[in-house]
C-alpha cells in the first residue's frame, strides 16, 4: 500500500536514516565544477583553518526581473514582506500559488528600485515567468543553470558566483581588492574591484 503522508513513508522505511540511506535517487550532480580539487579531507581542513573558494556559478538559475511592476510581481506572489526590501539587499523568497501552496524558495536580490534577480531552482523561476504574463508590466530574462553534462562544449553564464569561506576569507577579499573592504551585514551587498572587473560582495550567515 502506498504511503499517504511523510509519516507513513518514514514508518514503512523503518526510520529517517533507512529511508535516506536506501534512496533510489542517484547522486545530485553539480554541473561543470569537479566534486574535489585535491581531496575532501584537505578541503575541509582548509575551510576550517584558512580559506576556500567555492564556485557556485552553475547549479542555479538566474531570473532577471525589471520594470515598473517588478516589485508588485514579487509582493503579490511571495509570502515575504517587501516593505523594508532596500536596494543592495537580498532575502529568502518563498512564492506561493493563489491557493497557498508553496512553489519553492530561493534568494532574491534587489539591484535597483525596479530591478531584481532571483537565484535558485527552476520551479520558482518558471512560476514567476508564468505569473508575469498575467497583467504585470515587467521584463523577464532567464539565465538557465549550466548543463549537468556539457560534453566538452563551452559553458557561459550571465553571472558568475563565488563564495570565499573560512577564518582568513576576508584577508583574501582585501588582497584581491588591493585595500580595505567595508564589512557587509547579513544579506546586504557591497562592491569590490579586482583586476578583471567589478564584483559584488554579499554576506550570508
Predicted regions and their residues:
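Acidic, low-complexity central loop/insert segments
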Residues: 107-204
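Generic recognition of flexible, low-complexity loop/linker segments
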Residues: 48-51, 105-106, 204
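Acidic, proline/glycine-enriched N-terminal capping motif
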Residues: 1-96, 101
